[in-house]
């Protein structure tokens, strides 16, 4: 009996030590988010297409042709010293000296619907919300925060091609803002076109085309909801497009199944009386809405938020375990956070079926390789890519 007890205690002790010493537990995604660190705290998997993270302001790249120098501190969308969150967008650069992206921003709200982000000096001037760092959790593959203004808990995780949200609203009706005009390093006219189609009461599809660092960058999406939409609407908030077609005879800003324009901002209202969280899954594709739908189904169908979070955390643990070191906690945190930051970009740029849009604008099929983007080769050839040559399993 004594042998069994000792063996049981040894196993428990070993498992506790193993859990406490997972290398991913040393990663702090908030490191580098202050000043000019140009990192973000949100959820992603190693080299995934999705980098789902909070953006804390909307400073434009230029105003009337004049560069706004403050924008440089927002290369990754998040600035630690800010006290409000504009929303959660699905693409981010990490550690770069220039920026773009911030595609497909979502923000949960309650009460009066506002279709502008407002200003950070007054969070009530738009759909943004204040927050505190004590209510924020950032781990590899997971991010959560409490949005104070509307008392909403927001949680994020990700697969390679899908950003997964879980929002807990107060009892009543909950709103979800989807801003296709938002962007990082944004400016008037950067969004060339955007569209939104309500496929049914739990599914949206659409696209956003931008003219930024990447010229004519096409981002297609499919968005699913765990609750049916009660009502919805939207309008152009960017440069106004000219439309003289038949649909102008209808009110396209309320419960209209298709919307399009240079910079759409839309809202969707849900019944949250039961306190059950609203889960939102946003799949991206550079190819088509059909590609986004396939990414959505193949990567997330049948899996709960918690299961997808666990899968993301396991992917990070495997990736980071390629190098094992020993040291005190500060050294371990510094090392594994740095290693974590090397594994965000380059990022995946192809669908689950292996199709991708090339720089020629055409659709290609991969053959025995994985297609990536965001290489930043003028900086990374010196150290990052030699590191990949050492630690890559391929």
Residue ranges: model-predicted function:
Residues 21-394:
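Accessory carbohydrate-recognition regions in carbohydrate-active enzymes
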Residues 1-21:
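Bacterial Sec-dependent N-terminal signal peptides
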